[in-house]
């Protein structure tokens, strides 16, 4: 892949509308709500002794801003200028822009940062997985710049492989069917077409299960060279694999979770009813965190596998 991971990510995430669309995910998709609520709980209970943080693949600042509100100085690091611009806007609105340093860069190169530069290092919503085939090296570099705690979420193999046999999986998590988000409208308008065109392909499932790759690497590279904007080649981790990588780089007291493992069992009609009632929503998200933190379900999170540990 050489440096294709960086080039593909740069083209994908620097599309002009990325900042606005990503900033609205929690108003659009229920799985995003569940995942981010889980991470927020984990962060807020792990800030003892934390004064500085590095947010790798920080996007629109969902967690950079959260930590800055707690008085922490955050380095917001992302490959996308539209995302950074949106994060700056939101940080200004929240009154915490003076506590955030915005840096444009790729996770494949963290050489600008010295060992143990940050009390807390975090990287959420799978940017590590988008660095294939450099994902292990990137984890090692994130650990290297960590002084106290590291928290990451990567693409989950056990959580994602089933979706090769479910082309309408995202429909389950649509919160607002009237959303103008192009992805929402595509999910709704193409639902019957996706069902009609589906056929079970055992070979593709076995290949994804064994390799951690749900897409064809060479076809993705070809699409990029032809001027298209393909989705990043994404590496999906097994739980024990991720834990062993972290251990190899010296991380201790590791725990894993699968945000979305409980929510994925509930139909859209019920999920929407829960989300639209503040009391039910709060109780639901609290229970999701408890259930999804059970190590026996960590691999079956909606898309992501969460890990935290200490240096």
Region annotations inferred by a language model:
Residues 1-48, 50-57, 62, 151-212:
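Conserved class I S-adenosyl-L-methionine
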Residues 112-120:
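A short acidic, Gly/Pro-enriched loop at the edge of an enzyme's catalytic core
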Residues 62, 66-97, 101-109:
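Class I SAM-dependent methyltransferase SAM/SAH-binding core
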Residues 136-149:
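A short glycine-rich, Lys/Arg-flanked "PGG" loop and its adjoining helix->strand segment in the class I
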Residues 233-250, 256:
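Short alpha-helix
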Residues 120-134:
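A short SAM/SAH-binding and catalytic strip from SAM-dependent methyltransferases
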């Amino acid at each position: 892949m050489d440096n294709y991971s960086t080039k593909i990510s740069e083209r994908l995430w620097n599309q002009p509308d990325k900042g606005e669309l990503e900033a609205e995910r929690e108003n659009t998709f229920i799985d995003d709500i569940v995942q981010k609520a889980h991470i927020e709980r984990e962060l807020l209970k792990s800030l003892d002794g934390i004064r500085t943080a590095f947010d790798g693949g920080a996007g629109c600042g969902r967690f950079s801003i959260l930590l800055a509100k707690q008085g922490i100085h955050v380095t917001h690091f992302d490959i996308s200028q539209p995302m950074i611009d949106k994060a700056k806007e939101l940080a200004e609105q929240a009154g915490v822009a003076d506590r955030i340093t915005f840096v444009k860069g790729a996770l494949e190169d963290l050489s600008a940062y010295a060992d143990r530069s940050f009390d807390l290092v975090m990287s959420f919503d799978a940017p590590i997985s988008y660095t294939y085939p450099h994902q292990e090296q990137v984890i090692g570099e994130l650990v290297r710049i960590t002084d106290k705690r590291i928290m990451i979420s990567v693409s989950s193999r056990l959580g994602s492989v089933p979706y090769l046999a479910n082309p309408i999986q995202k429909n389950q998590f649509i919160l607002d069917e009237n959303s103008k988000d192009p992805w929402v409208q595509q999910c709704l308008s193409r639902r019957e077409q996706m069902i009609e065109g589906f056929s079970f392909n055992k070979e593709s499932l076995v290949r994804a299960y064994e390799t951690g790759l749900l897409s064809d690497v060479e076809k993705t590279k070809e699409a990029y060279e032809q001027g298209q904007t393909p989705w990043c080649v994404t590496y999906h981790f097994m739980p024990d694999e991720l834990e062993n990588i972290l251990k190899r780089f010296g991380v201790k007291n590791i725990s894993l979770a699968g945000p979305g493992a409980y929510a994925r069992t509930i139909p859209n009609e019920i999920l929407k009813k829960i989300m639209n009632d503040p009391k039910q929503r709060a109780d639901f998200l609290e229970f999701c965190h408890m259930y999804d933190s059970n190590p026996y379900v960590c691999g079956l999170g909606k898309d992501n596998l969460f890990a935290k540990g200490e240096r």
